[in-house]
Amino acid sequence: TGRAVTTYGFSEDCDARILATEAQGVGTRFTLRLPDGRVVASRIKQNPGLHNVSNGAAVLTLISLLGLDVDLAAEKLQEFAGVRRRFDLIGEAGGVTVVDDYAHHPTEIAATIKAAKALDFNRVHVLFQPHRYSRVALFTDIMRDEFGSAFDEADTVTFMDVYSAGEAPVPGVTGKTFLNVVTDHGHPHAVFVPRRIDVVPHMLEVAEPGDLVITMGAGDVTAIAPQLVDELGR
């Protein structure tokens, strides 16, 4: 088409190249060499994963091509808190960091856990709430292998019971259905906690200073995260 194309990424032949990354808390600091040779540093505040670094690099590259203030953009990027329920930092108490994430599809689950494991935490604990009885029945059937491996990198996995979202229960379908899929796949530290009232006490027993807890799912598991932070701080 005759239009100029500018590439960005980690490869040496990119016009804008990400030179280095460093995990910082629940975020990632990175340095970027711009197409004109300048090097800028910035930080993704609370969304881990190289894909988020790549997104940040794209923004700074575009800013530079438009002739705008890249240094100011790099500074402001560090203040961006990200999207709600996407590695949403809820708080830290008792040396334990708690984040909340909407992931409920196996690809999202695996990507979120992988990004978390790249951060500077001792262990990563996932509290997962399955969403809808119909989805659990379907996903653990036709996507059994994908869900079985999605939690592989988590140090521990705790399954809550199913968030119904208004659906009637399906006989034989509970949070334990997910547990069976994951343990059959070989995860050594996965459990099912059927009663909601027991979830926070269980996570208090599991998490230790230096650990990260991710409350995960599309249901009301998000309400557990602040409760857990409160209890950790007592």
PLM feature segments, named:
Residues 83, 115-185, 195:
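Active-site beta-alpha connecting loops in nucleotide-dependent enzymes
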Residues 198-229:
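A glycine-rich beta-strand to alpha-helix segment
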Residues 4-8, 174-183, 227-234:
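A short, gly/pro- and small-residue-rich
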Residues 66, 116-122, 206-211:
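Glycine-rich phosphate-binding loop signature in dinucleotide/nucleotide-binding domains
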Residues 17, 136-137, 168-169, 202, ...:
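Short glycine-/acidic-enriched loop or helix-start segments at secondary-structure transitions
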Residues 6, 19, 125, 156-158, ...:
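Hydrophobic/aromatic beta-strand patches that form the interior of the parallel beta-sheet core
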Residues 3-110:
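Adenine nucleotide phosphate-binding catalytic loops in nucleotide-utilizing enzymes
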